[in-house]
From Swiss-Prot:
Coiled coil region boundaries: none
Positions of Zn(2+) binding: 13, 16, 147
Enzyme Commission number(s) from the entry: 3.5.1.103
Enzyme class: hydrolase
Keywords: Hydrolase, Metal-binding, Zinc
Source taxonomy: Bacteria, Bacillati, Actinomycetota, Actinomycetes, Mycobacteriales
Gene Ontology molecular-function annotations: N-acetylglucosaminylinositol deacetylase activity; zinc ion binding
Protein name, per record: 1D-myo-inositol 2-acetamido-2-deoxy-alpha-D-glucopyranoside deacetylase
Catalytic activity: 1D-myo-inositol 2-acetamido-2-deoxy-alpha-D-glucopyranoside + H2O = 1D-myo-inositol 2-amino-2-deoxy-alpha-D-glucopyranoside + acetate
Domain of life: Bacteria
One of the GO biological process terms: mycothiol biosynthetic process
UniProt family annotation: Belongs to the MshB deacetylase family.
Amino acid sequence: MPETPRLLFVHAHPDDESLSNGATIAHYAARGAQVHVVTCTLGEEGEVIGDRWAQLAVDHADQLGGYRIGELTAALQRLGVDAPIYLGGAGRWRDSGMAGTEQRGRRRFVDADDREAVGALVAIIRELRPHVVVTYDPDGGYGHPDHVQAHVVTTAAVAAAGSVGDCDYPGDPWVVPKFYWTILGLSAFLAGRQALTPDDLLPEWVLPPEDIPFIYPDERIDAVVTGDSDARAAKIAALAAHATQVTVGPSGRACALSNNMALPILADEHYLLVAGRAGARDERGWETDLLAGLGFTGFGT
């Protein structure tokens, strides 16, 4: 019986998996791959959209994190993933908040003991034995401290998981064949932005600038996963499940966070390969399957 491919995505907060990799997760899950998502915090510091759940926020009841467990569970189900996995267990590390916000000092993820956090992820990697691991680039995508910390922890854990000499961590060593950063590709973003019309937006939304600093030029991209109509629909449904944090527009072609900046909901999701050997590439020089070169068939886009 052929081996089932396994992919692991590591994210900082609930909703990050759907925003960054929703189409990719849905694509592989629908084709029978084992897909897991590790979330490092409960997202307690998130800014709540609207009035219905506003009293859950950190400055009021401080119950947002628990509520977002339900949102993440629903989102993952819509993407085809069974249940969330929280690094260290649900609530072990707290959302650190955006850079420059008040430091509440209660088990913040950025203050996590490196060996404990890395060890928790090593244990997951050695148990699940993923063929592909995905997390953020060194800047955490857009610079959120928890995203940066997720990058640091994941990078260290991928290295330690395959080390035969490091016996302090549980489980048998597992060398991750391919390790990617999730990135935002320039051409796809600009095309998605340009395609948005007033019918796609809510009245209070504004379009993002064209020169967002954390976008990657096409020549730096190593891989793209293009979600089909089912994967894109699953991504939209998953984003809608994160209703305290994300609003999906009337057409399903755009969404916005609490800052009311409209973002195109892209079916193309881009990656940079940072460890492992690339598989077949297309005429752009991009892989179209994160599993390319690993001997699996039927998973490309």
